[in-house]
Amino acid sequence: MKQRKKLWMLAAILAICGIAVFACCMANEDNTSSTTEVAQYIPQAPDYSDATMWVTADGDTDGTGADVFYVVSTWEDDWTTEDGRVCHYADVWNPKHRAHMADLEMKKVAAYMSPGNRFFAPFYRHTTIQAFMTNNEDTVYQRTRLSMEDVCEAFDHFQAQRDKSRPLIIAGFSQGGLAVVELLKYIDDETYSQLAAAYVLGYKVTKADMAASSHIRPAEGETDTGVTICYNTVKDVKYVLPLIAGSDICINPVNWHTDATPATLPDTITITLSPEYHVLVATNYSASEYPPFRGFLNVGDIHSCEPWLYSECLQKNIKERAKEWRRTHGS
């Protein structure tokens, strides 16, 4: 009997020890997970007093143009440091990352936005494409906070240096379009009074955005100022990607209508605005130059076309709105 009692006591002790070991292992797993989260790498912040952090172009030979602040889109994947830490951001001090932003987009946009204007585009720690591929609003919001802080800091530096008697243009594509929306919420009323127009290319502007800031007013025509131009292009409304193109405003940059009046580009591509879905529908356009990207973009939407398909329309419109701003401000 005593022997049996001892065996039961031993079994109980072993069971308690087993539970303790299991709890310890689980705690270690939790600590490992926490360590993994902490072990993410955040690149060094930009220094916007350093000319290396900018792509600029001065095409305003007679001093009658606008100052254009342009925000580049997304060019980096998640990457890993030599010591194994994952990074969700572009590294502005990495020459390869800067080259991706500058050579693939910033300089090409400057080629049509800078003639007649002064063009400024900052490098910033933009969020990698993986955040957007989650299709999760919360993930995108959380990841892009660092990126938006960089953009706001760059804008403050730009604004402190520029001649404020000149009209201001803010423009950006994709993640850069998101940055334009955030900048409009960020700027004060005095800065907003200098705004000829803001261009959100290939991203959404929602009712919540407009409720958050009186600085976000949808453009209604070709020459109104202090307004936001927003558009996203698809082959059919069934291809609207809500995360990016689920907008509550849209204007056709070919004819500057906000209704379904179709407009034709010189190469017979017809662009028609859908008032129901607030997107542009392109017909007679294969968009073969923009192949599908990982089953996420360019799969019926034509996301990659936004800064390029309408470049001549945008170039002309920036001049028109800057001219109208000068007329109404006596500048």
PLM features per residue range, with description:
Residues 72-166, 291-305, 311-331:
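Active-site catalytic motif of lipid deacylating hydrolases and related acyltransferases
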